[in-house]
Amino acid sequence: MASCALKQLDAGHVELKTMRVGAAYRGSAAAQQVLEHALAQARAGGAKRISLETGTEAFFTPARRFYQRNGFVPCEPFGSYHPDPNSCFMTLAL
């Protein structure tokens, strides 16, 4: 159905490393529920910020819009990432 993974970057910063929802569940509340669970886990672990990397290609437009609707804003590369024209970096203060 769905999965996600968080990666600790430092004491107050985590990365939403992956988040996937099965095709049969896209457009349902599943993605929102998974994201809310991930945010709750990040907060419970003491994170003050959560960041993610997604693609810039048209295929990733729905994902970027989803994250924007949930308060994520564009940011600079974080962690071990470097500027990449195929990557979109986003962050959310928790």
Give residue ranges: language-model regions:
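Conserved acetyl-CoA-binding loop-helix of GNAT-fold acetyltransferases
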Residues: 21, 27-44, 65-69
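Acetyl-CoA-dependent GNAT
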Residues: 1-13, 17, 22, 35-37, ...
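Short strand-loop junctions, especially beta-strand C-caps/beta-turns
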Residues: 19, 24, 55-57
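Residue-level detector of intrinsically disordered, flexible termini
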Residues: 4, 29, 43-46, 57
